[in-house]
């Protein structure tokens, strides 16, 4: 019960802070992250479900999917901001991209997914540390599948590119974080159930590819987004039609791959 009330308090503080300061809600927004988490929940093994119950009781993955964004209003977590993205030049060949991804300095989205996965699977660590690793892992795998979290440094992953979504001024990153998803007009449970219909063989193929391939997929998609979304572009129905399939597939991939990682470390 203590964690419940703390979570609600943290949500209120974060949302109030965002409204007062104009800070954007980051990385897929609430609906996107919860959709990915709900899809993952549906692909967990029984063993993983039992292990998660020991850590978070009856709470769901979707419940904690946005916690790493909520804590951005707490300055003690400022060091975690770079964990949500990687920035590399555009239009890179796969081998060069992966080489440069592995050489990026400091802690970032690539390094921290691996760190959180290792911490979650380490049963010698305190439960609180493993819970924190779980919350971040849920969220960061979602961030990875938002293509502009594998964007370009010169425009801060699209944050500096102004676009107009049905005449509403915004930036390219926010469009992909929130507006495209909200335009579909589904709750996260509706969206998850709608998307979670692929054949098992396709799901297994997505899950089996290495982490570096997931990053490169997002990189390639981000290149296509940049090409279709120049500064001051006016976007609407045509843009949604162009990218809806990609949007849906990224959410689904994020969910089934998150489940694969959780099953990997919790079903031992």
Residue ranges and their predicted role:
Residues 2-13:
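Bacterial N-terminal signal peptides that target proteins for export
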Residues 14-19:
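Hydrophobic helical h-region of N-terminal Sec-dependent signal peptides
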Residues 22-24:
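N-terminal signal peptide c-region/cleavage motif recognized by signal peptidases
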Residues 26-140, 147, 152-268:
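N-terminal, motif-rich segments that launch catalysis or mediate targeting to/interaction with membranes
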């Amino acid at each position: 019960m203590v964690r419940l009330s703390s979570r609600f308090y943290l949500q209120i503080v974060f949302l109030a802070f965002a409204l007062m300061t104009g800070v954007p809600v980051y990385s897929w927004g609430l609906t996107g992250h919860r959709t990915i988490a709900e899809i993952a929940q549906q692909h967990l093994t029984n063993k993983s479900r039992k292990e998660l119950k020991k850590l978070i009781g009856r709470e769901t993955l979707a419940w904690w999917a946005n916690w790493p964004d909520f804590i951005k209003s707490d300055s003690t977590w400022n060091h975690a901001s770079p964990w949500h993205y990687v920035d590399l030049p555009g239009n890179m060949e796969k081998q060069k991209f992966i080489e440069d991804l592995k050489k990026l300095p400091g802690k970032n989205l690539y390094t921290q997914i691996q760190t959180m996965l290792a911490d979650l699977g380490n049963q010698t660590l305190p439960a609180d540390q493993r819970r924190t690793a779980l919350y971040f892992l849920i969220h960061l795998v979602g961030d990875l599948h938002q293509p502009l979290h594998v964007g370009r440094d010169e425009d801060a992953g699209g944050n500096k590119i102004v676009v107009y979504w049905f005449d509403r001024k915004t930036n390219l990153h926010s469009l992909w974080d929130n507006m495209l998803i909200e335009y579909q007009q589904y709750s996260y449970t509706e969206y998850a159930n709608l998307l979670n219909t692929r054949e098992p063989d396709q799901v297994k193929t997505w899950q089996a590819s290495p982490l570096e391939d997931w990053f490169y997929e997002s990189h390639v998609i981000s290149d296509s987004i940049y090409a279709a979304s120049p500064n001051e572009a006016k976007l609407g129905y045509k843009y949604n039609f162009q990218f809806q399939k990609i949007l849906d597939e990224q959410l689904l991939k994020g969910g089934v791959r998150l489940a694969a990682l959780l099953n990997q470390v919790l079903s031992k």
